Amino acid sequence: MKNDLTNLETKLILSLNDIIKFKSNLSNTSFEHKVNHVMISPNGQNFIFMHRYFNSTGTRFDRLILSDCNGNLLKVLADNGMVSHCFWYNDNTILAYLRSTNGKDSYWLIDINSGNYTGFEPWCNKIRGDGHPSVLNNLVITDTYPDKSRMQSLYLSQKNSNLEYKLGEFFHGFDFNGETRCDLHPRFSLCGNYIFFDSVFSGKRTLYYINITKIKERINHG
């Protein structure tokens, strides 16, 4: 659906059937289909979304699809079984944790024009799994799921750099699981001086923030 906030009009630009048929041989009866994680490009011209479908045994398959904002489906950016979390790196590039054509699950930069994949340094070779990346200007943030010690971590990096900064670790107890689990889901303030995140390390779900102005100074001075 496309919502015009000026005229308060809503228009269907893509149906689920359109998405199912786009560059696939999938049946809309053999699988359960869902669409989620819709994200509009910074320039407002395109958007990406996940086409997620399940077979009769519950096995999940993911596709990452690119469309323009008029509902013209443009390209399947990923169709290798698993797509997790994505963010627009810039108007022409997606940063995503997904399975690439070589079968590797990692952080990848995808050129929406060529479809080429490039490993995102410094995270593409780290063995710590999925996270929730977010980008603002030249800064990139992501998190981790709880490790064996039940600690979740925040990592800050910079575009075109191999450096990363660990901002902290936060305990996630077993009392929070299933629907009550709490991912950190880090995101930048618009000014870029703060990172906000959710956590349960205090024993209840709370929104926290970290001031990163000093770390940004360190990054900018190499």
Named regions from a protein language model:
Residues 20-47, 74-97, 124-143, 173-191, ...:
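Conserved beta-propeller blade repeats
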